[in-house]
Amino acid sequence: MTRRRQIYEGKAKILYEGPEPGTLIQYFKDDATAFNAQKKGTINGKGVLNNRISEHIFTMLGTIGVATHFIRRLNMREQLIRQVEIVPIEVVVRNVAAGSLTKRLGIEEGTQLPRTIIEYYYKDDALGDPMVADEHIACFGWASQEEMHDIADMAIRVNDFMCGLFAGIGIRLVDFKLEFGRFWDNDYSRVILADEISPDGCRLWDMATGEKLDKDRFRQDLGGEVEAYQEIARRLGLMPDGENMILDLESHRKNRGK
């Protein structure tokens, strides 16, 4: 396999230069972090599962007209994506009280919110990704008013679609994180959905039992992280019973010439 130049390495993914201008290869790692990387670990096979799950959701979002950076999955751990300029804002969509919302406002975990809440966080690990308002985003030029309108509109569309998708397989979509990027076409840019959608960035609870099937199992030392991610993939029809999607991280990276 041709050795590709590494562009960037984050907590959960690595970006390599793509085969064509304007493309990148997104590689999913098994590394797990929580609390702004204060807690670190490994979930064996997480990258394989997240690659499949994110591919599935991004592909389905594309069919309803949500523009994304996803082009196609290349192998078990990699997908080809459009190169974008990431907007430095994490968008969190909340349907049910959980996580930091319960701590900030003293709301009991699991409380159904009267309406969906969209929150914005400035992407800066050193600052702990602080929560910001629209006024901060406009003041510091992180995104234009038109871009924020498009981002909010896409976030609601993604939420509506995913709530139905997961409800259909017996899963409650509690909240999730989205990232967006500017896709440039000559001098014109538009905002499209980027990063990934997987159990790493979603809170997913079994509707019948309330069992957590996401990265909270790692955050809260509940154990069974691999089984939870596999259960999401299985219910989405991506992992037939008996199929083993786990792939050793180091051997795969050696094979690709890293």
From Swiss-Prot:
Pathway(s) the chain acts in: Purine metabolism; IMP biosynthesis via de novo pathway; 5-amino-1-(5-phospho-D-ribosyl)imidazole-4-carboxamide from 5-amino-1-(5-phospho-D-ribosyl)imidazole-4-carboxylate: step 1/2
Reactions catalysed, as given in the entry: 5-amino-1-(5-phospho-D-ribosyl)imidazole-4-carboxylate + L-aspartate + ATP = (2S)-2-[5-amino-1-(5-phospho-beta-D-ribosyl)imidazole-4-carboxamido]succinate + ADP + phosphate + 2 H(+)
GO terms for cellular component: cytosol
GO biological process: 'de novo' IMP biosynthetic process; cobalamin biosynthetic process
Classification via Pfam families: SAICAR_synt (PF01259)
Keyword NAD attributed: no
Enzyme class: ligase
Keyword terms, alphabetized: ATP-binding, Ligase, Nucleotide-binding, Purine biosynthesis
UniProt-listed Enzyme Commission number(s): 6.3.2.6
Any GO molecular function: ATP binding
The keyword Protein transport is assigned to this record: no
Homology family: Belongs to the SAICAR synthetase family.
Protein name, UniProt field: Phosphoribosylaminoimidazole-succinocarboxamide synthase
Gene: purC
